[in-house]
A protein has these predicted regions:
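A beta-strand signature from Gram-negative outer-membrane beta-barrel systems
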Residues: 128, 143-193
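Membrane-embedded beta-strand positions of outer-membrane beta-barrel proteins
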Residues: 190-194, 225-227, 272-274, 337-339, ...
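Outer-membrane beta-barrel and related beta-rich outer-membrane complex signature
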Residues: 133-135, 232-241, 271-298, 338-357, ...
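N-terminal Sec signal peptide and the immediately downstream disordered periplasmic leader
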Residues: 1-84, 88, 149-152, 210-215, ...
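Extracytoplasmic beta-strand/coil segments of soluble accessory domains associated
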Residues: 53, 83-131
Length: 459
């Protein structure tokens, strides 16, 4: 694919810079002045790779990359988190796919070249759910269910911490490749960003607007609100006479995120995070030939697409995430109780297509040989509920410092598959006769595929 225009990076840097200068926060300015007068080195706090509360990056025993969002904006010049980290973190990789039957609608991410379901993603130190999509049909990360990194707006993020080492013993088997912790902002003040980009070939136009505002909840807490709208245009690098479209998918994202905390009695603090995103995306499947090709009548109808056609796999994705918890001090012990909810749903709508068996039956019955050109192909959903109770204490006089931590976790998960409409999966002209059954581009889920499965785990 061609390189991005230099206009993209220049516009992004200037917009992020001007947004930061325009942010109004008297409290933040006062903190900056006070911090500048303080002697001593500034330490960055890391929450991955250690159960110790407020450990610095130099205290951890494992390699942790702490990537501030200011660096991402200046060096990456991207509009979404997955592609931004691709240019910043050496161990992180996210590859946009094409013609992958739904996997190209979600940019799954991974560490160290391992599967996307072997990288654990946290938000403010709490487990984030994976997508409902299982990557199949020859896609990258085949058989994996990754985490949708692009469901979180960039402007809501303070920094990203990447643990570039296996952490299965501490976090579970889904952390074999490493851990990514996304820390959200709670700073006071408001800022806004607008961006535009395109490829040098003139396609793949991207429009992004995002706004952040952090407000004080009296003198006891803060509430941060972030909204983002991202419109990514389709690109195509196939030959002019090709029956394929090879390039970025078309996507429209609408995202809202809340993050904050509120001090309770004593040393306790209530914290909360909530976010929701709706995404309408569209990718191109493999093309079908027209008159004179072997695709008629098996995969096409001369009456509908005499010159051939490219089916489009359209997906509507709903993603929801919420965490509420309470941290306090019980004697010398740090206590943290939390409840996390995650939900991801994806519905397929196949357009610019046909069911060749329906078209062939229509032709056999004296009709023109047509079928419907769009189908509801069904979909799937995934829900996860996680309850945690964590306790830790640091003994600074034992063996030059020793941290003791223990806790419990209960997790409940539910997975569903929904059937599509009959035309998306039926074969009406007889098996092995004439046109192939099912919608071209992506076959719909049948009633026999319908699933509602649950599982529970305690640790």
């Amino acid at each position: 694919m061609p390189t991005l225009t230099t206009l993209r990076k220049a516009v992004l840097i200037s917009l992020y810079g001007s947004a930061a200068l325009a942010a109004f926060s008297p409290a933040a300015m006062a903190q900056s002045t006070e911090a500048g007068a303080t002697d001593g080195p500034v330490q960055t706090v890391s929450v991955v790779g250690s159960r110790r509360v407020a450990s610095s990056a130099t205290d951890t025993m494992v390699p942790v990359d702490i990537i501030p969002m200011s660096r991402v904006a200046e060096q990456g010049g991207q509009f979404d988190l997955a592609q931004s980290l691709q240019y910043i973190s050496p161990s992180f990789n996210s590859t946009r796919q094409t013609g992958a039957d739904g996997a190209d609608l979600v940019d799954s991410a991974a560490l160290r070249g391992l599967g996307s379901d072997q990288t654990l993603v946290l938000v403010n130190g709490k487990r984030r759910h994976t997508t409902a999509l299982v990557n199949l049909f020859g896609a990258r990360n085949r058989g994996n269910t990754g985490t949708d990194m692009n469901a979180i707006p960039l402007l809501a993020i303070k920094n990203v911490q990447v643990l570039r080492d296996g952490a299965a013993a501490q976090y579970g088997s889904d952390a074999i490749a490493g851990v990514i912790d996304i820390e959200l902002k709670k700073s006071l003040g408001c800022e806004a960003v607008a961006g535009y980009s395109q490829y040098s070939a003139g396609d793949g136009k991207n429009y992004m607007t995002s706004a952040y505002c952090g407000i004080a909840l009296g003198d006891k807490g803060t509430l941060a609100i972030t909204g983002e709208y991202l419109d990514r245009g389709r690109s195509n690098r196939a030959d002019a006479d090709s029956m394929r479209i090879i390039g970025d998918t078309k996507s429209q994202n609408k995202t809202l995120y809340l993050n904050g905390d509120y001090a309770t009695s004593g040393t306790g603090k209530l914290y909360f995070t909530a976010g929701a995103q709706t995404r309408d995306a569209s990718s191109a499947a493999f093309g079908r030939g027209g008159i004179g090709s072997d695709d008629i009548p098996s995969r096409n109808s001369a009456a509908m697409y005499p010159d051939g056609f490219v089916p489009f796999i359209n997906g509507k994705i709903d993603d929801q995430y919420a965490t509420i918890g309470h941290r306090s001090q019980i004697g010398e012990w740090h206590a943290d109780f939390s409840q996390t909810y995650g939900y991801n749903k994806m519905r397929y709508d196949i357009s610019h297509t046909l069911n060749a068996s329906i078209a062939n039956l229509d032709l056999m019955n004296g009709g023109k040989g047509v079928s419907a050109s769009s189908f509801d192909a069904g979909g799937f959903s995934f829900q996860q509920l996680t309850s945690n109770a964590d306790f830790s204490r640091y003994y600074d006089t034992v063996m030059r410092g020793m941290n003791v931590a223990f806790g419990a976790e209960y997790r409940s998960e539910e997975y569903k598959i929904m059937a599509g409409e009959p035309g998306s999966y039926s074969d009406v002209d007889g098996v092995g006769v004439g046109g192939n059954g099912r919608s071209q581009g992506f076959p719909g889920f049948q009633p026999g595929d319908v699933t509602k499965a649950k599982r529970h785990s305690i640790a």
